[in-house]
A protein has these predicted regions:
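A sequence-level detector of short linear motifs
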Residues: 225-227, 253
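Flexible, glycine-rich phosphate/dinucleotide-binding loops
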Residues: 59, 122, 150, 235, ...
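Radical SAM/AdoMet-radical enzyme domain recognition
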Residues: 3-23, 31-144
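Short loop/edge segments at beta-strand edges and connector loops
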Residues: 54, 205, 230
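Radical SAM enzyme [4Fe-4S]-AdoMet core and its adjacent flexible, acidic
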Residues: 84-87, 92-225
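Flexible mid-to-C-terminal extensions adjoining Fe-S/redox cofactors in radical SAM and related proteins
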Residues: 232-305
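Conserved G/P- and acidic residue-centered "switch" motifs that form tight phosphate/ATP-binding loops
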Residues: 27
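Canonical Radical SAM [4Fe-4S] cluster-binding loop centered on the CxxxCxxC motif
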Residues: 1-3, 255
Length: 305
């Protein structure tokens, strides 16, 4: 989709009460002019704020422009602090790039800086180590249950030989690799106690700004919080108020469903009534409960997480 097409779609969506936007991917900062797009979307009547989800590697270059464009919140994906595991899972960049991106986001004064970590049993992650990013800085770490998005057992050619087995382990979803939130919270809390940070306590104040489903906890004395998103063990479909517009112009009412409503042909035909019809159909057909065990054909990078 062109920026003009995205802008026209958001203008129509704003007429239905859409107020909050998130730019995601894939990697949104790989799209030339991402900050310009954010600025154009913020200028649309009715839009109140824009957030972005990124792998963080390009944030040192673009954080200033994004903040100036009106982006208020940033989520940074970081699943591990182990360099070898990071290389095997991400296949590009380095942990240092991401950490510099986190620093850049804080320096530019984004209202909320969050780190998203997908908890995967096969990765044997240092969960408490990741939460320590928020010990002295207002970084909010959220742990997300591993979900069946996409289905690919093919090992890309650029994976180092020593990392190929690990990539294969985490590229094809296996229910046994999903760590339920109750178990994960216990793991994080007990690790905090062993490290002298004390147990996790329910977060009754200082919760980060946002409109998502995370339940927040914190370690006493930490500036940041620890959130848990229970997409698998305790779905929150009845509270879901999100629609996803894919890069190829399809409106998706549920992350876990392959049901999509094309809007790009109508946008290119300047048929706003057809766009509205697709939007209304997507709203009507948001499922009461996702069927996450079925998986999806598209990858998260194609849908927008």
């Amino acid at each position: 989709m062109s920026f003009e097409e995205i802008e026209r779609f958001v203008s129509i969506a704003a007429g239905y009460g859409i107020r909050h936007l998130r730019l995601t991917g894939g990697e949104p900062l790989a799209r030339k002019g991402c900050a310009e797009l954010a600025s154009r979307l913020m200028a649309i009547d009715g839009i109140e704020d824009i957030a972005i989800t990124t792998n963080g590697a390009l944030l040192p270059r673009f954080a200033h422009d994004l903040r100036a464009a009106g982006v208020s919140r940033v989520n940074i994906s970081l699943d591990t602090l182990d360099p070898a595991k990071f290389a095997a899972v991400t296949r590009v960049g380095s942990i240092d790039d991401v950490l510099r991106g986190i620093d850049a986001a804080l320096e530019e004064g984004f209202e909320t800086v969050k780190v998203n970590t997908v908890a995967v049993r096969a990765l044997d992650q240092d969960f408490f180590g990741i939460t320590e990013l928020g010990r002295d800085r207002p970084i909010h770490v959220r742990f997300i249950e591993y979900m069946p998005i996409g289905d690919d057992e093919t090992i890309p050619k650029n994976i180092p030989e020593e990392g190929s087995a690990l990539f294969k382990d985490v590229s094809a979803w296996d229910r046994s690799d999903t760590i339920p939130t109750d178990e994960l919270r216990r793991i994080v809390s007990e690790a905090g106690e062993r490290a002298g940070a004390g147990p996790l306590i329910a977060c009754t104040k200082d919760r980060p700004e946002g409109h998502g489903p995370a339940q927040y906890w914190k370690f006493e004395g930490f500036k940041g919080t620890v959130g848990f998103i229970s997409a698998m063990s305790s779905h929150f479909c009845s509270q879901c108020n999100r629609l996803r517009l894919t890069a190829d112009g399809n409106l998706r009412p549920c992350l876990f469903s392959d049901l999509e409503y094309p809007v790009l042909p109508a946008l290119r035909a300047h048929d706003d009534d057809a766009v509205r019809a697709a939007f209304e159909a997507a709203l009507r057909n948001k499922p009461d409960k996702h069927k996450s065990n079925d998986g999806t054909e598209r990858f998260m990078s194609q849908i927008g997480g």
